[in-house]
Amino acid sequence: MHTDLWERGCERLAAELPEQQFNTWIRPLPPADVTLAGDGVLVGLRVPNRFKLDWIRAQYGSRIEATLSELAGKPVRLELSLLPRDAVARAQGMAAAPAAQAGAAPQPTQSPMAIGAALHAAATARHDPQSVVPTPGGSANGRAAPRVGEPGGPVGTSTLPVAPTLSPAVSRGRLNPALTFDTLVPGRANQMARTAALHVVGAPGHMYNPLFIYGGVGLGKTHLIHAVGNALIRDNPDARVLYLHAEQFISDVVRNYQRKTFDELKAKYHSLDLLLIDDVQFFAGKDRTQEEFFNAFEALLAKRAHIIMTSDTYPKGLVDIDERLTSRFDAGLTVAIEPPELEMRVAILMKKSDAEGSRMPEDVAFFVAKNVRANVRELEGALRKVLAYSRFSHKEISINLAREALKDLLSIQNRQVSVENIQKTVADFYKIKIADMYSKKRPASIARPRQIAMYLAKEMTQKSLPEIGELFGGRDHTTVLHAVRKIGGERQKNTELNQQLHVLEQTLKG
């Protein structure tokens, strides 16, 4: 029989997969139902929510089947299904019970191991008096458990303010329901940030906490953190999720400072399960705001709530922000969102035009994508111009129509960005001579800026590789291609280089 097939499979997967991946996605799963099915084996797994089901199927399904087939010596088919909602709730209660019985404060999220151990029992529990599981804030007999500081309750500091529950309706009110993972176009530019965000949804409070996402304006940072909030609320409607811009937090601090009501501020922010905050660079120079955010930050991490922040620069690049904050920002995972590459820009245009009910032909999408390189926001603006021009003129969408609709934008871009301008800007930035861009000198202090200038020339102009090579002292197109690939690859890994390129791009765009 293959009764221990899943257990042996887990041991194999634990040895082969990165520890964080295994602990997040595989280890929490309840014991599998293993049955013989003809010449093969059927392995049934029950998963607590739709997001995890889709992710496990897409990322690990084939690998799980292959591993189990090898161990079983016959074909294995993996069948994933959703656990009933009440079973998930009972599992979370069972995972929390030992801590509650020991007098510990219940955590907002349980460890993957604890929840996984409880899922199977919860799914098969019978509705009898012996199987009722105490829930946080309640007891097995259905009566509410006394709170700290109440008569008959546990000994505690009754003078501390009790944090009011943040209404999920209020939390959802600040989230844009249209900004989801389904409407986010994936690509190389946002791959790391998107993957990290998906891991947060799968195991909030456990991985990449805090998650710090940085990048230029209009690249999709806000979309991504809204997607996390929407996914978490979809899977757990009672989750206390709050999205806000940094300026809103500043306003809250000022208002509560004027009213001397800082307990209200703490009650609002310290009771969350997920805090999503945009543009933390706005905290610069605001000492009281930084102090209150530090307090909220520490309180949330202590209760294993998750924090996701965005900024226009990486933590160490933030100016006039206390080092104890920036060091904590950098303590989890810091990822960049880059300007979208050509193929991603085309995919964005096609998807957005479909959503508008007007399919953009692929050749037109490539034309627009080649000419609008800055960010997703400008790309969407260009799309709206083309679609509006098509409707108003009653003409089919074509390259000529797009060229006419975007003539002002194209003339500005052509006037602003040239290879010569790029060479001058890069030379000034790295303090070398413009003549070094054309020379045959190869010291790293010159060759590196020259490669960066070639990369920017390919990314920001319409010039071909041979044309760019000619403008860099008659170099071969393969030299340019090597520079483009080298700098493009390093940009994904080197935070300092990415920041330098971001500054250069913004300077060139004016």
Swiss-Prot record:
GO biological process: DNA replication initiation; regulation of DNA replication
Highest taxon, organism lineage: Bacteria
Assigned keywords, A-Z: ATP-binding, Cytoplasm, DNA replication, DNA-binding, Lipid-binding, Nucleotide-binding
Binding-site list for ATP: 218, 220-222
UniProt KW Magnesium keyword: no
GO molecular function terms listed in the Swiss-Prot or TrEMBL record: ATP binding; ATP hydrolysis activity; DNA replication origin binding; lipid binding
Annotated region described as Domain II, given as residue ranges: 74-173
Xref: SUPFAM superfamilies: P-loop containing nucleoside triphosphate hydrolases (SSF52540), TrpR-like (SSF48295)
Region (Domain I, interacts with DnaA modulators): 1-74
Domain IV, binds dsDNA as annotated region, ranges: 391-510
Region annotation (Domain III, AAA+ region) ranges: 174-390
Coiled coil: none
Region described as Disordered: 125-168
Function, in words: Plays an essential role in the initiation and regulation of chromosomal replication. ATP-DnaA binds to the origin of replication (oriC) to initiate formation of the DNA replication initiation complex once per cell cycle. Binds the DnaA box (a 9 base pair repeat at the origin) and separates the double-stranded (ds)DNA. Forms a right-handed helical filament on oriC DNA; dsDNA binds to the exterior of the filament while single-stranded (ss)DNA is stabiized in the filament's interior.
Free-text note on domains in this protein's UniProt record: Domain I is involved in oligomerization and binding regulators, domain II is flexibile and of varying length in different bacteria, domain III forms the AAA+ region, while domain IV binds dsDNA.
Database matches in NCBIfam families: DnaA
PANTHER family on file: CHROMOSOMAL REPLICATION INITIATOR PROTEIN DNAA
UniProt protein name: Chromosomal replication initiator protein DnaA
Organism field: Leptothrix cholodnii (strain ATCC 51168 / LMG 8142 / SP-6) (Leptothrix discophora (strain SP-6))
